[in-house]
A protein has these predicted regions:
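Edge/loop elements at the starts and ends of beta-strands within beta-rich repeat scaffolds
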Residues: 35-43
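Bacterial signal peptide processing site
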Residues: 22-24
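Post-signal-peptide N-terminal segment of Sec-exported extracytoplasmic proteins
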Residues: 43-70
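Short, low-complexity, disordered segments immediately C-terminal to signal peptides
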Residues: 26-35
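C-terminal motif of bacterial Sec signal peptides marking the signal peptidase cleavage site
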Residues: 17-20
Length: 228
């Protein structure tokens, strides 16, 4: 059965499942940034793409005007990209670019991340560099502000879809340890190590469990970087 997007986002989410209407985050992460943050204690800023589900991209200007002010108040360097007609799905997207900070620290209170999303990196007891994704309270604040502008539907942050391309821009090879994720389209249950030669990259999509941890706990392990 094909459902028209005009049914509205709330009906769409109910019809096809909540996960289908989650915000989407994608972008590039660099092993060199992990090393820089660990060595200098200074944050590194990288642009990330944030896709916010909407009912219909044909009403782009209306959705853009509702969402952008809240995102600008709670994120850094917000740039509107486009409204995307997501073929084959019951929703479309407002795509924006936001700055995401990578800071040094292992605990939730370590390192100041000023936007909605970011990452913390720290060496564990075996000297491995853990990469932890972070959702700050500003994410919930932005969603609440956007929700207040929609009269007949609820905008809630119940899940999030993440897709990251991890690039090795170092002069030497590195190992990335991932678990509970899809790596280059392959489902990885237990921890597995992937070699990243110089200038190589892999695409990592964390599982729903890790995404839900990010929503519920404000943080989720992305993976571990081992350097030669």
């Amino acid at each position: 059965m094909v459902l028209p997007k005009a049914l509205g986002l709330a009906s769409i989410c109910l019809a096809v499942g909540v996960a289908a209407c989650n915000p989407q985050i994608s972008g590039d992460f660099y092993s060199g940034d992990v090393v820089d943050v660990l060595e200098t204690d200074k944050p590194v800023i990288v642009p990330m793409r944030l896709g916010m589900p909407i009912q219909n991209e044909k009403k782009c200007e209306e959705h853009k005007n509702k969402m952008l002010p809240a995102l600008e108040r709670n994120s850094n360097n917000v740039k509107f990209l486009n409204c995307e007609d997501v073929q084959g799905n019951m929703y479309d997207l407002v795509n924006v670019e936001i700055d995401a900070e990578t800071v040094k620290g292992m605990d939730v209170g370590d390192g100041q991340i000023s936007g909605m999303f970011g990452a913390r990196v720290a060496k564990d007891e075996t000297n491995r560099a853990e990469i932890i994704f972070v959702k700050t309270p500003k994410a919930a604040k932005a969603i609440k502000e956007i929700d207040a502008l929609y009269q007949f539907q609820s905008i809630e942050l119940k899940g999030i879809e993440i897709k990251i391309r991890l690039n090795n821009d170092l002069r030497q090879a590195a190992q990335f340890v991932a678990g509970s994720s899809y790596v280059d389209g392959r489902p990885i249950d237990r921890e597995a190590s992937f070699e990243l030669k110089r200038r190589a990259f892999i695409e990592v999509v964390p599982s729903n469990v890790r995404s839900q941890s990010l929503i519920a706990n404000g943080q989720s392990l992305f993976g571990v970087l081992l350097l030669d």
